[in-house]
């Protein structure tokens, strides 16, 4: 049900905020713009700057309102008037980050706005002291037991207010944050859900709730308000849960209803494509976003990750210099510079910049993960483990941190730990072949060969990014003396390489041709064996074996040895490789395609 214009400010500024009536759909974009402008002001008054910026950016993407439709500021209550002087002074102190001073002058204030700023100042004071302690004991890697000492007191006071039903939407949001910081996750989720019902326009509450949801099943059981804000929340959580197809559909719907100029939505779409490793699409969107919003810093660390993967040194260098000119002390800027140095193999400098990012914001997920990668490059496994663990503390859905831990314990030759972490990464990214190949290698080391085979085949079935799954599966069949299955895997590997037009010159291609040459030779299929042996001659490591096999085939033919008719060939070479243009047949799936470990 759409809300009338007059209802919105009254609902928000009521003494004890009731459920806020806002639009349930996007049928009235003018009304939505009014609501966004209103909440941008209310969050700014309370020092919730990120929520204010998000609302303002979204409002800016909608058509401007005529003067007659612009809303006046919300009416001032009697309590607001009594606390006005204290609030004005305290807000000035708050804005320059003198949180204790702000809290001191707000003590005893009764208005909702002043009370929130009082409690929020105390919370941020505790966070600042904790972060200072963290930096002093450095590195961010020795964060250890440093806690925000204000949390327990804040919880007690906010709990009393909550039980008395005296918290408005902002108060509920802060109570939820305190509960989350105390690791009271279930209670925090309940409070954040309540906050979204009381004040659906506050993006910060939705975002905090998003950070606590671990899977789609958990999402289904949440009782969320039926408002247009829910669509933004669902698009965001789908992206976080790696449900990229659903996320992209949601964002496309938001563009279609009128938010096509939103830089937030465009950036989220780019992040979604980054998450599914559609690098070209993601790069294209980020480049377009940079043209529209050249001074934007948000998500530029993700953009730099894409440039890093593509080894685009000059573009990454330009991005790093550009962001330095805009704001060298932003966490995203530090991460971009870190990526630049990492691409140049200057890993100590890269780690230093990731540490700088963490001094600015110890809860910045990307910096922890990237620093873990750098410590891995420097062979400092203990520091890498700590960095990845901190990343998981910040966000348990970060598959890169779980995967990094798996790699670290693999280096330490601790396969059971390795298996646990790779499993967690696979749960978060079930269709990522890298996780499946890593799992397969782990099972192989633990001599659980059946499970290893399942993983390798599944990795191939979901789309093998690194084109190694079939080779590893073939070698496993070799180890088990399952020659026919090994040959099937190698021929499919060769077919895949040549069908997609890749020019691959590495050890595994030569390994495949060598095995196939020997396999066909044993089967007395001279034409196929000869073709594969000739291919072996193109590689340094198999050239001599290829020549020797060709000599043997020639000798046997000269002796009148005829090809066998008794041993059936399970498949044939691609027509482009076969001397006699034998047609190809699709490889049997080994009955493993539907099985996951």
From Swiss-Prot:
One of its GO terms (molecular function) is ubiquitin-protein transferase activity. The keyword Ubl conjugation applies. The modification Phosphoserine is found at residues 578, 588, 593. One of its GO terms (biological process) is regulation of mitotic cell cycle. Keywords: Acetylation, Cell cycle, Cell division, Isopeptide bond, Mitosis, Phosphoprotein, Repeat, TPR repeat, Ubl conjugation, Ubl conjugation pathway. Phosphorylated. Phosphorylation on Thr-562 occurs specifically during mitosis. The modification Phosphotyrosine is found at residue 273. It comes from Homo sapiens. It comes from the Eukaryota. The modification N-acetylalanine is found at residue 2. Component of the anaphase promoting complex/cyclosome (APC/C), a cell cycle-regulated E3 ubiquitin ligase that controls progression through mitosis and the G1 phase of the cell cycle. The APC/C complex acts by mediating ubiquitination and subsequent degradation of target proteins: it mainly mediates the formation of 'Lys-11'-linked polyubiquitin chains and, to a lower extent, the formation of 'Lys-48'- and 'Lys-63'-linked polyubiquitin chains. The APC/C complex catalyzes assembly of branched 'Lys-11'-/'Lys-48'-linked branched ubiquitin chains on target proteins. This is Cell division cycle protein 23 homolog.
